[in-house]
Amino acid sequence: MKIGVIGSGNIGATAARLFAGAGHEVAVSNSRGGAGLESLIAELGGRARATGIEEAARFGEVVLVAVPFGKYETLPAEAFGGKVVIDAGNYYPQRDGNFARLDGGETTSSELVASHLKGARLVKGFNTIWSEHLKQQGDTGLPLEERRAIFIAGDDEGAKRTAARLVEEIGFAAVDTGPLGEGGRRQQVGTAVYNKELNAREAARVLSAG
């Protein structure tokens, strides 16, 4: 599969390594048009390339967006049309500035991203795990129920299945928290699943209790 990765920070670079290691072709982008990614691309080998943001979005059948939430409106929306987009962002007011609709609980960050990327098949995911845990805790040798959980949410069931397959290929278990709105709220900063080291069995128990 071809995967575009928007953002080369901790989550983006780690995910790119894992996707390439699982045999996928990866285009990694940053705000500098791919400049400065030479060492990462060399590490990933022939399955990876450095690109600009729009090129990475057009390249990927799946696109992982791992940039600060406050920059979401700078994404070239047309390039994401029809793509399965995994939004790994979280809203941090101290970093992103205040968004009244989020502060008032009217909507969620991923719903705002989805409204900007019209035509994209958006899934919330990869936002509740530290990058070091993403790097270290995947294990394809474990049964799914014993693997570290990565939570996903979305309104497009087919897109969620695609995201879940990628999660499983890199050694984790996808745990569905529901539709983009309700499910996204269950993944927000400070919730019972945010950055908690839960396997899939434990995650299901926590979600059912909530």
Tell me what each language-model feature is.
Residues 45-97:
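Rossmann-like NAD(P)-binding element
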Residues 89-140:
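Rossmann-fold NAD(P)-binding glycine/threonine-rich loop
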Residues 43-47, 103-104, 139-143, 192-195:
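Short, hinge-like loop/turn segments at secondary-structure boundaries
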Residues 50, 121-125, 175-177:
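General beta-strand structural signal in soluble alpha/beta enzymes
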Residues 77-82, 117, 142-144:
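Short, conserved loop/helix-junction motifs that constitute active-site signature segments
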Residues 1-43:
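NAD(P)+-binding Rossmann beta1-loop-alpha1 motif at the extreme N-terminus of oxidoreductases
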Residues 145-210:
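Active-site-lining helix/loop region of Rossmann-like oxidoreductase modules
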